């Protein structure tokens, strides 16, 4: 899956991030996302007719990714849905959210990477096939240090009243927001293609490394 394309810089209020040019990027608002998705899929299939058999898969995946991003409060959602010669496209997504929290006394939670990592739990897999999570810090060029988790995790389904989860490759990077006490930009990459976990970790790391706050 080591097929890298030209990067497309996407700008949103307060930040910018680069994703591969072949990725899908669209408005996640409910009133406009369906039209946006159908328009993009039609344009992509006109340019690449060989992808036509996967049309329904693309539309279904993109609609679900957009809905989940909206429910989770994401400001940005970029999606990968690539056909590498297999029967089903390989899918993944990256979202950016602005999150924050307060202590029981009402004080803003610290956003220093070391303080954030101290609050994040490592999870070891007890047996093959179990979920797991590692916690570390990374340095984002032009931004600075940030806390990060990555692993195979059971992710809650946004808005699901039954509390169901989906097992996924997940990387989350917590970037302190300059001048906003207690706020971090959460850059999250996920995919349900567990067999390609290491490849997705590389992709999510590469995309996150392009994150910048707008001047």
Over which residues does each language-model region extend?
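N-terminal targeting sequences that direct proteins away from the cytosol to non-cytosolic compartments
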Residues: 1-167, 171-215
């Amino acid at each position: 899956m080591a097929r890298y394309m030209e990067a497309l810089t996407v700008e949103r209020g307060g930040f910018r991030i680069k994703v591969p040019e072949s990725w899908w990027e669209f408005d996640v608002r409910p009133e406009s996302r369906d039209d946006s998705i159908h328009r993009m899929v039609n344009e992509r299939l006109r340019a690449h007719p060989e992808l036509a058999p996967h049309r329904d898969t693309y539309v279904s995946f993109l609609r679900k990714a957009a809905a989940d991003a909206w429910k989770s409060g994401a400001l940005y959602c970029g999606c990968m849905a690539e056909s590498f010669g297999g029967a089903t496209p390989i899918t993944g997504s990256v979202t950016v959210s602005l999150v924050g929290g307060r202590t029981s006394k009402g004080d803003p939670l610290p956003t220093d990477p070391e303080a954030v990592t101290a609050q994040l739990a490592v999870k070891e897999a007890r047996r093959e096939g179990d979920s797991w999570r590692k916690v570390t810090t990374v340095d984002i060029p032009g931004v600075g240090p940030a806390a990060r988790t990555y692993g195979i995790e059971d992710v809650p389904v946004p808005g699901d009243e039954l509390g169901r989860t989906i097992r996924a490759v997940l990387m989350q990077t917590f970037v302190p927001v300059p001048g906003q006490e207690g706020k971090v930009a959460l850059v999250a990459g996920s995919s349900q293609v567990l067999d390609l976990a290491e490849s997705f970790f590389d992709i999510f790391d590469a995309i996150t490394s392009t994150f910048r706050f707008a001047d």
